[in-house]
Amino acid sequence: MADGSKVFKKTSPDGKITVYLAKRDYVDHVEFVEPVDGMIVIDPEYQKEKKVFVMMTCAFRYGRDDMELIGLSFRKDIYVQSCQVHPPLPGEKKALTPLQEKLKAKLGGNSFPFSFNMATNLPCSVTLQPGPEDSGKACGVDFEVKGFWGDDVEEKNSKKNVARLIIRKVQYAPETSGAAPHAEITKQFMMSDKPLQLEASLNKEIHYHGEPIIVNVKINNSTNKIVKKIKITVEQITDVVLYSLDKYTKVVCCEEMNDTVAANSAFTKAYQVTPLLANNREKRGLALDGKLKHGDTNLASSTTLRPGMDKEVMGILVSYKIRVNLMASRGGILGDLISSDVSVELPLILMHPKPAEGTTSAEDVVIEEFARQKLQGEQDDEEDKEEAS
């Protein structure tokens, strides 16, 4: 059984509808996105007189829940796709996927298939980290699949009759990458005949979350100043492009080195920096992958755009850069009072590696309740509380 195909399920609070999905994360390959397909089990009583629908929604939330109580809505649906699963509409019958066939055999005649194809221009799942005192749902882009009944797909339903699941749209690092970033600068100081040269480079273009980043620093100090401080910072730049032109820059890693470079000397060294969410828990507005407070959440991955894609529909764009900064000053007690900064910037692409291809050829299907884990190891029941309210 452990080698079976894992399937996730979520049941409505009234127990009448259960939605099954093969995965929680759906990969955006830039040219296409993995289809969202699954099965929905409907109580026989519902099948007699009710229509049952499945809907997938991509939404952008850019305000707090409590503001909606006074009539202000800070949620915008970017993309909505729905289908009627019962009674099935004529002419819409599609071939079942291999996993749907296994689920159909396991779940019986009260189960019905559904499938959605995401548009390629949708944003990936991103959450903006709230501050310590913030409450309610976090701002960001999320995807939801829900099963519900009603006379019409637009009908407002009781939360007790809805089975809702939050899924994620993710991007993985491409199998091929470009040239490793490199930058250099030459700085001429007053009272010095020769300049200071700073050169910085990375070993590769794409880095994975949690992987140490090697920053190669080369300094040719032909001046009469002393380089007293070398600082390397990793910055996250978040462009909120859907409703405004807001841009947020957050330092996610900062390392100050004790190395010094004397006047008229050269210096070469490779440093390691590792930006981690664990060191940035309190930073409000930091972009994270997917929904917050889950054990598999990390700093947001760099956004990859298809050529010609409209950036505005992407909602939130995330990028990173590494800054290498030198503080140069004259010797003596008063030297630091007239110090000068010399810096270069390197682009950084931070992503997840593409996981190994899974298999759905096993005979058994392992069904797991659709619940992620909080960072503290407790079940995330935020959605269940909302549905029961």
Swiss-Prot record:
Gene3D superfamilies reported for this sequence: 2.60.40.640, 2.60.40.840
Keyword terms of this UniProt record: Sensory transduction, Vision
GO molecular function per UniProt: G protein-coupled receptor binding
InterPro entries the record matches: Arrestin (IPR000698), Arrestin-like_C (IPR014752), Arrestin-like_N (IPR011021), Arrestin_C-like (IPR011022), Arrestin_CS (IPR017864), Arrestin_N (IPR014753), Ig_E-set (IPR014756)
Glycoprotein found in the keyword field: no
Reported tissue expression: Retina and pineal gland.
SMART domains: Arrestin_C
GO biological process, one term: visual perception
Keyword Thylakoid: no
Superkingdom as given in the UniProt entry: Eukaryota
Protein role: May play a role in an as yet undefined retina-specific signal transduction. Could bind to photoactivated-phosphorylated red/green opsins.
UniProt record similarity statement: Belongs to the arrestin family.
Protein name: Arrestin-C
Taxonomic lineage of the native organism: Eukaryota, Metazoa, Chordata, Craniata, Vertebrata
